[in-house]
Structure formats: structure tokens, C-alpha cells
UniProtKB/Swiss-Prot annotation:
InterPro entries: EF-hand-dom_pair (IPR011992), EF_hand_dom (IPR002048), EFHD1/2 (IPR040365). Ca(2+) 2 binds at D136, D138, D140, K142, E147. CDD domains: EFh (cd00051). Keywords: Calcium, Membrane, Metal-binding, Mitochondrion, Mitochondrion inner membrane, Repeat. The keyword Metal-binding applies. Residues 28-42 have a biased composition (Pro residues). GO terms for cellular component: mitochondrial inner membrane. This is EF-hand domain-containing protein D1. Acts as a calcium sensor for mitochondrial flash (mitoflash) activation, an event characterized by stochastic bursts of superoxide production. May play a role in neuronal differentiation. The gene is EFHD1. Residues 1-48 are annotated as: Disordered. The keyword Repeat applies. One of its GO terms (molecular function) is calcium ion sensor activity. GO terms for biological process: regulation of cellular hyperosmotic salinity response.
Length: 236
């Protein structure tokens, strides 16, 4: 009986040790590498949703005037302001760069203040802000070169009030732009109408000459056909 109990205890002891050895790694064996965390399957979708949400929020801000839209369009002054000569645009560009003290491609409020003082027409703070606002297409509170040209375009078209700061800028600039209509908008547009009238007259004369040549060609063909018929009649 005692031997059976001892054998039973030994058997249980062996089973217990074998169970522990199965849980422990073998001596000298390299430990299994820890599994790397896998990114959740919804991560790309979450990023796409975040980007779309950011785009929608920016569009809402632009529509509400809280953000400025990015301008990707390339500015071509000669095509956008065809009423100005290339020389005039070059002169206006030189003037713009002269007062762009920060060399950032814009004339800000302080630079505009200095410009108007040098031109002999100083403006109040509110007056300067009003000048910028009148041509500030992108609502950034400063003048780009395109907006600077727009001042002279509006002056030539008679779209500025005579006593406005922008009209003073256009009139007092050192550049002679009278021929372009800034100081004589009426003469400018009358000259433009006259040029269009001359062009229309030239086109009318050219068309009349073309019609006359067509009629002469038709008459010549009729005469040739009649001659061939007459010749055929005599040959018969």
C-alpha cells in the first residue's frame, strides 16, 4: 500500500515537472519575436475622411470670407490690360517696385501711406484702407501688381470718383499716362471707338473687293462657257 502511494506521488510529481517544462523555453533557444502591432484596417479611410473634412472646412471659410482662396492663375498683364501699352505697363511696374519697400510683391498699408505722401496727397488711415478695399480682389488688405494696374484701369474707364484717393494716385503719378486715358478717359475711349470704326470700315471695303472679284470671276466663267458653246456650234 505504501509503495503504491509513493509511486502515485512520484507519478504526479513527474507530470507536474513535465507540465512546467512545456511552459518554459528551452535553454539557449532564442525567444520568439514579439508580434508587431498592425495598423487598423480603417486607418487609410480615416485619413481620407480627415483630408476631405479639411477641404470642406476651407471651402466654407472661403465662402464666408474667413479664408482667402489660393490663386493659381498666372497673371498676364499685357493680355488682361490690352488698353495699356507694353511701355506703360513696364513704367507702372517700375513704380510699383519703387514703393514695394518690403520686396514681397505687394504694397501694404504703410507703403501706400508713404507713396501718397511722396505724391503730395497724404491720406488718413481710413482713407488708405478705403483705397485698398476698392481694388482688393483677394481681400488680403494689400495691393498686388494686378490690383495696382486695376487702379489705372478704373481711372481710364471713369469708374473712380474725382476726389477719391485712387484718382489722386493715378493723376499724381510721375508716369505720363494721359494718352492711355487716366487723365483723359474721354479721349482714350473716343480714340478706341474711332479705331474700331476704322477697322470696321476697312473690313467693309475688303469684303466689297472680295465680292467684286467673285462677281468678275462668275462673269468670266459665263463668257468662257458661252464661247465654248459657240465654238462647238461652228465645229458641228
Amino acid at each position: 500500500m505504501a509503495s503504491e502511494e509513493l509511486a502515485s506521488k512520484l507519478q504526479r510529481r513527474l507530470q507536474w515537472e513535465e507540465g512546467d517544462s512545456g511552459l518554459q523555453p528551452a535553454p539557449g533557444a532564442a525567444p520568439d519575436p514579439e508580434p508587431q502591432p498592425q495598423p487598423p484596417a480603417w486607418a487609410p479611410t480615416a485619413r481620407a475622411d480627415a483630408e476631405l473634412s479639411a477641404q470642406l472646412n476651407r471651402r466654407l471659410d472661403i465662402n464666408e470670407g474667413a479664408a482667402r482662396p489660393r490663386r493659381c492663375k498666372v497673371f498676364h498683364p499685357y493680355s488682361e490690360f490690352p488698353e495699356f501699352s507694353r511701355r506703360l505697363i513696364k513704367d507702372l511696374e517700375s513704380m510699383f517696385k519703387l514703393y514695394d519697400a518690403g520686396r514681397d510683391g505687394f504694397i501694404d498699408l504703410m507703403e501706400l501711406k508713404l507713396m501718397m505722401e511722396k505724391l503730395g496727397a497724404p491720406q488718413t488711415h481710413l482713407g488708405l484702407k478705403s483705397m485698398i478695399k476698392e481694388v482688393d480682389e483677394d481681400f488680403d488688405g494689400k495691393l498686388s501688381f494686378r490690383e495696382f494696374l486695376l487702379i489705372f484701369h478704373k481711372a481710364a474707364a471713369g469708374e473712380l470718383q474725382e476726389d477719391s484717393g485712387l484718382m489722386a494716385l493715378a493723376k499724381l503719378s510721375e508716369i505720363d499716362v494721359a494718352l492711355e486715358g487716366v487723365k483723359g478717359a474721354k479721349d482714350f475711349f473716343e480714340a478706341k471707338v474711332q479705331a474700331l470704326s476704322c477697322a470696321s470700315k476697312f473690313e467693309a471695303e475688303l469684303k466689297a473687293e472680295q465680292d467684286e472679284r467673285k462677281r468678275e470671276e462668275e462673269k468670266r466663267k459665263v463668257r468662257q462657257a458661252a464661247f465654248r458653246e459657240l465654238k462647238a456650234a461652228f465645229s458641228a
